[in-house]
Amino acid sequence: MATLFIADLHLCVEEPAITAGFLRFLAGEARKADALYILGDLFEAWIGDDEPNPLHRQMAAAIKAVSDSGVPCYFIHGNRDFLLGKRFARESGMTLLPEEKVLELYGRRVLIMHGDTLCTDDAGYQAFRAKVHKPWLQMLFLALPLFVRKRIAARMRANSKEANSSKSLAIMDVNQNAVVSAMEKHQVQWLIHGHTHRPAVHELIANQQPAFRVVLGAWHTEGSMVKVTADDVELIHFPF
């Protein structure tokens, strides 16, 4: 058996091929797993569990079917869907996890996260992240009418796109010191995350031992998952 990890699908109505590919994944590979972990940015945007978006209901039902089949499903928030709440989690049968979680998998201690907190060189983003994760600000935003939330979210996405266009690729990648610090804090030799859209398996030293950082790819033109078994940790790409 295997435990599966995915991230950065950025589901939206404008990308039906990705949605169709994810539905096939849920109906196939996911049903064979010991567990499924979604490490953030499942959706391109999330302005509240109360948004009457048919895509959200469709995805909730599909994930719930996996959960009901006996495969536990877990979710860590990303930078796009950090407002996804308990209502959607309940509807989809997912368990919400903290932003950093250590798993014991087949004899390995594995740290999982979305990955945006590792990009500490991007001071502008980290300041923005700290602001929008304030509970009182989230409560205020979610209390606004839906049409107002949609306008604010659209403006924020436009501002983010403009800001990122002038940033170097290095700044938007993880900081190696932040990676080592996180792994040593949790005493792990394995880290799995998404966010950067730069799929790879990196070797490093943490806790004075060889360690590995596995980065999930985004679901742009193909699917991406990490498959952890008793024998191996594989980064796998597959067609929709």
Curated annotation (Swiss-Prot):
Belongs to the LpxH family. It is an enzyme of class 3 (hydrolase). Mn(2+) 2 binds at residues 41, 79, 114, 195. GO terms for biological process: lipid A biosynthetic process. Its main location: membrane. It is a peripheral membrane protein. Pathway: Glycolipid biosynthesis; lipid IV(A) biosynthesis; lipid IV(A) from (3R)-3-hydroxytetradecanoyl-[acyl-carrier-protein] and UDP-N-acetyl-alpha-D-glucosamine: step 4/6. It is found in: Cell inner membrane. InterPro entries: Calcineurin-like_PHP_ApaH (IPR004843), LpxH-like (IPR043461), Metallo-depent_PP-like (IPR029052), UDP-diacylglucosamine_Hdrlase (IPR010138). This is UDP-2,3-diacylglucosamine hydrolase. Keywords: Cell inner membrane, Cell membrane, Hydrolase, Lipid A biosynthesis, Lipid biosynthesis, Lipid metabolism, Manganese, Membrane, Metal-binding. Mn(2+) 1 binds at residues 8, 10, 41, 197. The lineage of its organism: Bacteria, Pseudomonadati, Pseudomonadota, Gammaproteobacteria, Enterobacterales. Hydrolyzes the pyrophosphate bond of UDP-2,3-diacylglucosamine to yield 2,3-diacylglucosamine 1-phosphate (lipid X) and UMP by catalyzing the attack of water at the alpha-P atom. Involved in the biosynthesis of lipid A, a phosphorylated glycolipid that anchors the lipopolysaccharide to the outer membrane of the cell. It catalyses: UDP-2-N,3-O-bis[(3R)-3-hydroxytetradecanoyl]-alpha-D-glucosamine + H2O = 2-N,3-O-bis[(3R)-3-hydroxytetradecanoyl]-alpha-D-glucosaminyl 1-phosphate + UMP + 2 H(+). Coiled coil: none annotated. The gene is lpxH. Substrate binds at residues 79-80, 122, 160, 164, 167, 195. Binds 2 Mn(2+) ions per subunit in a binuclear metal center. Its EC number is 3.6.1.54.
